[in-house]
Amino acid sequence: MSAAAVEHPCDDEPEPMLVTANRLMGQLPGHRVEIIGGVITVAPPPDGPHANALTTLMIPFLAAGLHGDETRVLQAIGLWLPGGPEDYAIPDLAVVDADFDEHLVENNCYDPAVFRLVLEVTSGNYKSDLRHKVSAYAEAKVPVYVVLDRRHGRLHVLTEPTGCTYDSHEVYAPGQSAELPPSIGADLTLDVAELVEVGRPRT
């Protein structure tokens, strides 16, 4: 998602960041507000190709049986991050344990321990998904992070989180197939060419 940082006016007692974030969500319907590394970011509503790519991505996850008794496939579910006292992210897509609703932390966000995979489809600010969120999700020990980079026509699969990074970072181009780790709960391979084509930004 494309994101812009939000500046805070100077005052003696600034409101908590979660309060600011929730106020912005109320003022900007359809926008995605997150706190990553102690910085509030606001992403505008996605364009059509972004939404198309996300739906196309969901199909193989559902076909693999990942939306069942053991795991669920969910869009825009809040993930509470350990990187800051009020940090959270809202990935475009996630595979979570089926009992995720028993692990609510705060502000409609859930314990990162229930997340088996998170996935982002980039918009204008692709660097956030490939930099800041890499650190955030790795620190949260999310086992698999997938990024569809629409700008460069690539699919990134990051695994083996260690500290603030992932030890394994595979990049796939059209014509290749990306095999995801079975730890997500099923054997699953993504057709990179199809995803790049449906997600291609229209200029």
What does each model-identified segment do?
Residues 1-203:
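Gly/Pro/Ser/Thr-rich low-complexity, intrinsically disordered segments predominantly at protein N-termini
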